[in-house]
Amino acid sequence: MTWRETLCGVLVVVSTITASGVKAQEVRSDQDILMQLERDWDEAFHRKDVAVIENILADEFVVTYSDGSRADRSKELRLATEFDQQIDSSLLDEFVVKVYGDTAVVWFTQHLVGPSKGRSLALTFRYIDVFVMRAGRWQCVASQSTKVTST
């Protein structure tokens, strides 16, 4: 078999695989995974979906809220079930994600819009969350939010 025949055979196999719809497995970066975890957490909180949040938060999770109060995992989960403020929209943006081995830090901004006392209220918070990689998945161990008073 000549090199041309071999090349033609390889091209036929490659084009057959491509035409049959075989796709390479999509590989997501840690940055993409962490940003999606933040979005999943936000959506789950507003839906009161504690199961999703339980999978994201590590057992030793600690949060410092924008008023300076601090809470643990159990209180954060309880707050998710008690959440009763109507939210028209919650947008997360301005992500900065840094991965340091099995630790990652995620900074982002949250824009909330919803009714308050008959008027539309818009609030902005900046977050910093710390994640660790355990058993092949990212878990949040610490979070802090700061209310933005002016932009």
Give the role of each language-model region.
Residues A24-T151:
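A beta-strand edge to alpha-helix "cap/lid" segment located at domain peripheries
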